[in-house]
Amino acid sequence: MSSIISNSLRILNSETFAKRIAEQPTYLFIGKDTSWADEELPDIPTESTKDLTQLYKNMLAVKRVTADTMTSVIQRINWTSNSVYDAFDDTLNMIDDRKSNGTRYRYYALTDEFNVYKCLSNNNGAASVNKPTSQQITEFKTPDGYIWKYMYTIRSTDVFSFLTQDWMPVYTIIANDGSSQWQVQENAIDGGIHDIVVKTNGASYNPAIPPTVVITGDGTGATAQADVHPISGAITRILITNPGVNYTTATVTLTNIGSGNGCTSVAIIAPVGGHGKDAKLELGGVNKMIKMTLNGAEGGAFPTTTFRQAGLLYKPLSTEQGSKITVASTNGFKAGETVTGDTTGATGVIRLVDDNERTLWIDTVVGAFIQSETISSDGVSAAIERVVNNTNLVLVSTVASADDVVTRTGEFMYISNREVIARNDTQTEEVRFIIGF
């Protein structure tokens, strides 16, 4: 038996991850102000109990991750003149498959205007010399014979935050933002045929009266025309004049061929939804980049020293105490509101709501909540299923020193050992992680 994890599931997992850490306190941590045995060769991180415990001991400070500090990314491929780009091929997984030489498929390109284009046809493997610039809804042909599809433009704020030498942001828009990308998504052609690849050119076709291209399949409307070499009579290219719609299978034949013979070709069908419908899925947005900025001492929480470890710590506990309450439903409860127990009269302020675990973290507690009583807040109520009073509360502050984090609480989600980074109170560091799914 063989199986794969689909890119759709990988993207779903990446979005679930991003949503979870945006809603529940997750922190960048930095640590280890002491030297590695070899400062140019940091230790390889492990998840042994001993090493995870040592991470807490090494920890210097933490800063909370927010939704605007992360985005989906794909490998950066720049458009450069005289480079060959791979044309989309519906028989390949161009995200994960590799060429015979082990390299990735280069089937999209980023221009210096921060536009991203998908290559639908590369003029039989020719070099691209004309930069694509159009943001039109449909695919377009450049003078060098390439056919490109505009996908999206990297947002100006993301250029500075998430565009690096190796990675670039990728988006699929879920609501009309007035952008060209939205128009491309809304007008994508499901099951369109945007390229026909000539496998064998044949010979002796009449250039004065080119053969008729017939596309047969389960869709409708696709048409194309053949280019014939003026001397050999070979079919040099078949150009799409109408991509049609709703094809899942298609064959290409030539009629009115005269004495011509030997040409074979294959229709390339667009992905589900059509080219440009889902840039994140089409280009392989299975990675998340998290970019955190550390500004000097961060108000005193961060020491201005060296560090050699960084990573993500999910829901650590703080040294502050209060109540952890599991309820039948957290629906309607909001952080910052006061809750009251209907039996005990105990009160407290909601610090954090965790819908997945049906948990309310309560600080500023007066009295003691008990199991089975009902708690109420601003017209919302729920029965307590379990309560732990006088317990350490989840950390929610924006920044905190290591002394504010309870050792061996929370979950390490990412660990990075690196060469020494020296800090000072006038310095800003940018720390980036790539999380793959």
Task: Annotate each language-model stretch with its function.
Residues D144-F437:
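Conserved, function-critical positions that sit in or immediately flank catalytic
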Residues M1-A188, V266-P271, Y314-E320, T340-G341, ...:
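Tryptophan-rich substrate-binding surfaces of secreted polymer-degrading and adhesive proteins
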